[in-house]
Structures are given as structure tokens and as C-alpha cells.
Amino acid sequence: MKVVITAGGTGGHIFPALALISKLKEKDKDVEILYIGTTDRMEKDIIPKEGIPYIGIEMKGLNRKNIFKNIDVMKTYFRAVKKAKNELVKFKPDVVIGFGGYISAPVIYSASKLNIKTIIHEQNSIPGVSNKFLSRYVDKVLVSFKESVKDFPKDKTIYTGNPRSEQIKDIEKISKTTLGFKKDKALVIIVMGSLGSLTMTKKLKEALPLFKNKDYQVLLITGKNYYDDYKDIKLSSNVKLVPFIDNLIGLMKDTDLIVTRSGASTIAEITSIGLPAIMVPSPYVTNNHQYVNAKSLEDDGACIILEEKDFNKDSLVNLLDKTLNDKEKLKSMKSALLKRGIIDSATRIYEEILKLVRDE
């Protein structure tokens, strides 16, 4: 089987795509994969390092602030369509699968016009612009949230979950003691995205001194961009700071509570692990989709939302104290998260691919 994968821009699109690629290689030793991404976003570095054949196509996203700039965007789009068609004709894939990001629009559209079978996967609870546009052209739409089924054509939409979830379950646990934390004390991880957050850095700096003498431990992952902002803070013995952690998933499996954003990949991670979470949705994303992601979990009793506008040193510490002291709440959140998680999601997507390719 020959498969083209397209996704770009952010880890929320790229890592689910990589999870599916891993499953494809596991199930079909002869599978041929081509990844089409952009020429200037993070996938251009990540994908080749994984040994996956990569083609970059120039593409720009829509400008929501200045619509006149979208004239150039449309010119770039039509050039990208032409380039994508040429690459697809050369590769001759059995199926083209898009995981979002604006590069997926010209690639999936081109595939549909060439009568190549097409699938898109939506990671968030609110569809992205590219996937909403593409849904009318593709053969199948796969979604991570049951709530988003209604946003796509009913006859072609299937709730499969996020393929990242299946990958996570196989990652080995890392003991918190490897980072110098005590085994018998609860651990809280605080992380505001892989790069960190400018707005949250100031709030978290003010909160750190309040963790002194608490009966739990705190690991703050600052993000590489903001680690130096904390250099003047004197830390108590139960608090540690790191710019990043290579295997965060493994450590999350020995963690009691996480304070985090609510992007699609994070949702996949905590539902797969069953890790109770205080979610601080980023208010700076399209359609406020992180809040909707988190609300979907909160409505099932699977997380607690603390909005950024309400986040300060006192609200954070008080909520941590309250939550960690409520063992029944932690237990019920863990149970609700595991019910939401689809830990065979990549396998489900693989099976949908086979059905489509075989015309079943």
C-alpha cells in the first residue's frame, strides 16, 4: 500500500500523523509512505529525522486580521495545488490522509480531483478551517471528539479518537525519583505548552514561593523560551524547574495531577493515561477550541477548568490544595478520563483506511 500523509504547522497535527505512520509500518511491512508538509514549519525538521520521505510545498495560512493579504494566500494556494498534483501523480498513492494545518488543504483537494481516495482527521472539538473546507471533498472524516461528529457530513464521519492515544499506552513509566522527587509525596506537573507561555510565566513566578511547606511536590516545565525568566527565583526543596523533558509522557505516568493547556495532543495524553488535570485553555487559539476541548472533559467530570483570566497565584495554589486533598475527586477524574480515552485509536484508523482502499 502507498500512503501520502499531510499535516503541518503544530505538534497537534504532526504527532497524531506520526502515530498513524508508526501503526501503518507495524501492520504493513511493505507500506510506502510520503509525507507532504510545508517548506518553513516544524514538520520540515521533524519528519526527515524520523527517516520518512518528505516533500515541502510553500503554503500560507489565511490572514484573519487583514483580508487583503489573503490575495497572496490564494495565489500561494493555487501554486501549491499544482505542485501537490504533480507529486501525487508521480507517487501514485492508494490513499491520501490529512491531519490538518493549512498545507493539508491543497494536498487533499488535489488528491480528490485526481480521484485518489482521501481521509481527513480532526483532532480538536471545533473543526479547523482546512478540515471544514475539505470535508465536502473527502471520502471519510475521522474525529477525536464525539462532539465534533455533528460538524461534518453525517454519512462519512466516524469517531475514532486520536491515534496519539494508542502510541502513549506503550511508553514506559519513568519514576519521579529519577528527577530527585520523593516517592511517597504527590507530584504535580505544571506545563504550558512545549514552548511555554509569556502570559503564564509572570503568573507562575508569583505562585512558586507559595509552594513552600506544601505536602506535595511541583515540577514546573517552563519551556525553552522562558527558563531564564525564573533564574532569580529561590525555590523551596519540593519545587524543581526544567526547560523541557524528553520523555514527559513516561513521567506523567508517575504523576498525581497536571496543570496544563488543553490542546488536542494533551487531551489524547491524559485520557490515555488517566491523569487528573487542571486545564488552563489557551485563549489565543482559533475559535477558542482549547476551551471547548476542556469543557468536553469537564462535562464528563474528567478535568477541572481554570481559565487564564481567573488564574493567579492564589487561585492556582488553592485549587491544587483542594484537589490533592480530595482523593475521591482524583479517583473519579481518573476513571472518567480512562472512559473517554480510545486506546486503540490508531488501529481503528488503520482499519478505516483498509476498508476505503479495498472498497469495503
How does the language model describe each region?
Residues V3-G8, K27-T76, V81, T160, ...:
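Conserved nucleotide-sugar phosphate-binding/catalytic loop shared by glycosyltransferases and other
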Residues R41, I46, E50, K173-S175, ...:
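Donor-nucleotide binding loops and adjacent catalytic segments primarily
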Residues K83-V96, I103-I119, K132, R136-Y137:
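Glycosyltransferases and closely related glycan-assembly transferases
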